[in-house]
Design a protein with these regions (language model features):
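Hydrophobic positions on the alpha1 helix immediately C-terminal to the Walker A/P-loop
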Residues: 306, 310
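Short beta-strand-centered segment that lines the nucleotide-binding/catalytic pocket of NTP-utilizing
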Residues: 317-334
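Conserved lysine of the Walker
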Residues: 303
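Hydrophobic anchor at the beta1->P-loop junction of P-loop NTPases
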Residues: 293-295
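Conserved nucleotide-sensing/catalytic segment adjacent to the nucleotide-binding pocket
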Residues: 331, 335-378
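Glycine-rich phosphate-binding loop used to anchor ATP phosphates in small-molecule kinases
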Residues: 358-416, 466-480
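Auxiliary tRNA-acceptor-end handling modules of aminoacyl-tRNA synthetases
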Residues: 52-73, 85, 94-105, 109-275, ...
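Conserved NTP phosphate-binding and transfer environment spanning the P-loop NTPase/kinase superfamily
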Residues: 288, 411-555
Length: 555
């Protein structure tokens, strides 16, 4: 019997395909050339993997490895192929555990436990096996199983962190991916075969290795590896502290919440952060010649609360801190430059009156009395309201702004008078041993919650603006992070369980017809891994209060 023919609109052209054909076959037969490979499709606005089959008339859009979602799928697929190749080379009996930790440069840092020796020769063999799997276009399968069956499967394969994670999942089904004999669970979509996995490298690093990956803008080139040792060691230290509390993965956190509650974890985390801030203040004071504390970090890092808490610690050490916001040195709005999209660019250095900033700061350093400006965000004008300042022996300026680590901002100030601090929310928790939590996700959820509370901004608006925020960070903050004298991790191991309560209603408010719905759906799925906790026990000086409300600081 002939199969029913269905209408499929691709790039404005209506085509006919038989019901049940795979999207892979449609892509291959379309004759449409794309700059980079098609890895997923959008079917009536919904993402679908290429092994899925056509069920009804639809509009079809191709998602390539150069698209954000497509590139994330590519990276996830490389990780799956890597894991299979490790077991191929070492033998399953010689590998107890392979763990993904955090991003390093353009790649991911992994460690491995077991009898297999981790050296460059081993990595070269793994790399060769990955290319073999890719050259053979080894299929990547997907099947849906009952949650109980998935838990048993994870136990059988000694994936105990996944086993613990799914004990707390409310879903009845779990998607399991496989490449040959190797089964695993991944949070997110996957390629339909290993043939995509062409561009990567493996390099020994610290106690493990780095899986090097391309950049999305050029997905066929591996950029040179530049170790970021300072931020790496901050992440490693945070992870080690989490491990000391027996909370490395989301399942561990959920287990702790259900058995003991969160109070002790909360108090220990807050104490660790306070000790870190105190150490930073002690170092600043002990160096003796610092007058300008330059604080920078990406969006929603908790810079404002951190500045307040550092100021308190500096005061406790006998100093007299004065906050200075670089935003007060914005040029008048009519003089703000435009970005490549024709929009006002408030995040570039050129939006700041750098000359006036240096003139004022140098005058303060020389003991002069200076009237400081205040930027009026309603009128878009810089104003002077009689705010005078003169620095004495114990006075010190705490300067917060995204360009704080860039010496072009403070070019006239002597290097020895500056102390640079980089702050970011470097998530120390992962979903499980093979599914990391990107630090950007934690910051985006923080921002969604804060902006809704303080600015009345919808989650839809925050998500829509996020790519622009990220571009500003890539250009103005991340290139200078290793210039910092010290780094501070503002992430709290329990925070996503708390933020969930505030973020979920905001994300559910995004309609399915909106372009931001896909990201909202992804974040909701992510938050569903966590058991929620109330915010009542969070101290009022906590960095997290900057986002959920109730801070004792003016944030």
């Amino acid at each position: 019997m002939d199969k029913k023919m269905l209408k499929v609109v691709i790039a404005g052209e209506t085509r006919m395909y038989p019901e049940g054909i795979t999207y892979r076959k449609i892509v291959d037969e379309s004759g449409i050339h794309t700059e980079t490979p098609v890895i997923l499709v959008m079917v009536n606005g919904k993402l679908r993997e290429l092994q899925k089959r056509l069920k009804s008339d639809c509009t079809l859009e191709f998602v390539t490895t150069k698209d954000h979602i497509g590139f994330e799928t590519y990276k996830r697929s490389v990780c799956l192929v890597l894991l299979r190749a490790i077991y191929d080379v070492a033998g399953r009996e010689n590998v107890d555990k392979v763990m993904i930790h955090y991003s390093v440069g353009n790649g991911y840092y992994f460690t491995m436990e077991g009898k297999a020796a981790l050296d460059q020769d081993f990595l070269d063999k793994v790399k060769a096996q990955m290319h073999k799997l890719a050259d053979e276009c080894t299929p990547i399968g997907k099947r849906s199983v009952n949650t109980d069956e998935a838990v048993a499967l994870f136990h059988k394969h000694r994936m105990y962190d996944k086993e613990k994670l799914f004990r707390f999942r409310r879903v009845s089904k779990v998607n399991i991916y496989n490449i040959g004999y190797y089964d695993d669970y991944f949070y997110g979509y996957m390629a339909d075969h290993a043939g995509y996995v062409q561009y990567f490298d493996l390099k020994l690093y610290d106690e493990g290795f780095v899986l090097e990956l391309p950049e999305r803008k050029n997905p066929s080139v591996i950029p040179p590896f530049h170790p970021q040792d300072k931020i790496f060691h901050v992440q490693k230290e945070s992870q080690e502290w989490a491990e000391k509390m027996d909370i490395s993965y989301v399942g561990d956190l959920n287990d702790r919440i259900t058995k003991e509650g969160i109070s002790n974890v909360l108090l220990v985390q807050e104490a660790l952060q306070e000790a870190k801030i105190s150490d930073i203040a002690q170092r600043i004071v002990s160096e003796g010649n610092k007058k300008f504390i330059m604080i920078a970090g990406p969006s929603s890092s908790g810079k404002t609360s951190f500045s307040h808490r550092l100021s308190i610690q500096l005061t406790a050490h006998g100093m007299k801190p004065h906050p200075i916001g670089v935003d007060n040195y914005f040029k008048n709005r009519e003089d703000t430059p435009f970005d490549e999209f024709g929009e006002k660019n408030y995040e570039c250095l050129e939006a700041i009156d750098v000359e006036q900033f240096n003139k004022d700061m140098l005058a303060l350093l020389n003991g002069e009395c200076v009237e400081l400006p205040v930027f009026n965000f309603k009128t878009g004008l810089r104003e002077y309201k009689g705010d005078f300042l003169k620095l004495g022996k114990d006075d010190i300026l705490v300067i917060e702004g995204i360009h704080g680590l860039n010496d072009k901002l403070s070019y006239a100030l002597p290097a020895e008078s500056k102390f640079k601090i980089y702050i970011s929310a470097l998530t120390q928790l992962n979903i499980d041993e093979h599914n990391r939590i990107p630090t950007t996700d934690g910051r985006l959820i923080r921002r969604i919650v804060r902006d809704a509370r303080t600015r009345g901004t919808s989650a839809k608006e925050t998500i829509a603006r996020w790519p622009s925020v990220r571009r500003g960070e890539e250009a103005n903050i991340f290139p200078y992070q290793e210039e910092a004298d010290v780094m501070f991790n503002s992430a709290l191991v329990y925070e996503l369980a708390c933020l969930k309560v505030y973020a979920e209603p905001l994300l559910f408010g995004i309609d399915k017809s909106e372009p931001e719905y896909l990201e909202a759906k992804r974040l909701l799925k992510f938050l569903d891994y966590f058991i929620s906790v109330p915010s009542e026990d969070i101290p009022h000086n906590s960095l997290l209060r900057e986002f959920v409300g109730g801070s004792c600081f003016d944030v």
